[in-house]
């Protein structure tokens, strides 16, 4: 009986393998010139789910396009329960494709990779599980044309960068204006990836490299994980890719005519996929193929890089696990967190850059000099990459944050990100550190539906504040500590304050009629000699103020008991003892 069961199992696996070998992709059918439509992508993955026990297709959250995200789970034993996967000591690699559907290389490379896995043409180790989003920006994928990305070499047709709200989803991970981003956050916390990959295509200079790599900034990732990323993980990928026939180069973050002079490493703040992943102590990578290379070369390079990531993760599974576990524990007890970094141009690493000589020639459009790269003049040169970003500013960790329940949009995002918090059970007075926004700058041009606040200056003071039943108490003893710091501290680059979630405090809601307040102000000054002294001193030191009656009246109002306390008071409070 046992022999019969084994024979049946072998026959079942053989049938699956033969069947999967017969599944070709639109990319292959077109000989590397086409990428599938959204519906072809989903139908293809459904067939893989049906024909292989290694592949499970899950339906996840809804997007702005009216279609749900899907998640493909690939494992040798067919397990798609992520709690079990973690208990069984397996590393999880989350691969995101089609965030910019005009850059579909990862869509096709992932299909080829998984088809080869189930056909036993490429074997993944038992200690690795792949979680793949087949296409993230569904709205952009549906908006298909041959005319977008005029300077990209294939495929024949592809999707659009913006989603159904015309948002760039690779700027939406913190602010989460889209349903797409919210569905992604659910996937991210479901999978809890050890390694995250977000497949892209680059723009910018012309050079010989097919694949460039944007690695999450190692100083920002920080600690032993950052050191391991910089000294072990990333160099191993470069070595592996060279063995596979591809010379990697850091993402070419240069938009002049001489990239051979070097460039600063791309700064991936938390608005970006890789920066968001770093907040959760995940090794994050953004492969960027070169737009001018033929499509089939770009897909093959993406395939090879995903193989390299899988192979390193499998080989170094225990080291990755240990580093992440140690980091998660240390972040719970850390006493301060960085909120800004600055580029150090005195430090760099050297890489071999394979470029083309650039020059100027008359433009046939304007007649003026224009840049061009001469592919008949390739060169190789060792160049500097400025990849050190030391901490510029840090904040001491509070015992907890408290957010009044009225700021429910922020509360929703914290809950979405699995932040641990409790609602106050009764009205209570708590001594807290409160911030007042002293100054800030707002961008004049809109950026992804927002006018970003920056250069924020604050004044902190200890106050007793009355909180109501239902306000939210957020303890700072959790894995989410870094996420909380970089979203709730107003001076952080991608804080919720920066993204305008608290802009209502920046405008006064009450005022006065000058003629009516004049007599009230005069009486108030008679009874408040300290304020009268301050007013007189201001007149002596500020000539324009001394000549402006309205400004002086407003000075009295702003320093009186009638001035609204909510104006410029940041509504996220810090419990400090």
Describe every region a protein language model picked out:
Residues 1-24:
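Bacterial Sec-dependent N-terminal signal peptides
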Residues 21-33, 95-97, 168, 390-396:
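Acidic/histidine-rich, surface-exposed loop or edge segments in extracytoplasmic proteins
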Residues 28-35, 99-103, 170-174, 223-227, ...:
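Second-shell loop/turn segments in exported
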Residues 39-93:
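Soluble metallo-hydrolase cores and metallopeptidase-like ectodomains found primarily
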Residues 86-99, 104-258, 265-268:
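Active-site/substrate-binding loop(s) of hydrolase catalytic cores
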Residues 254-432, 436-437:
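Hard-cation-handling environments
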Residues 362-499, 503-522:
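Feature captures C-terminal
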Residues 480-482, 491-577:
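Accessory, solvent-exposed terminal regions and/or long lumenal/extracellular loops of proteins
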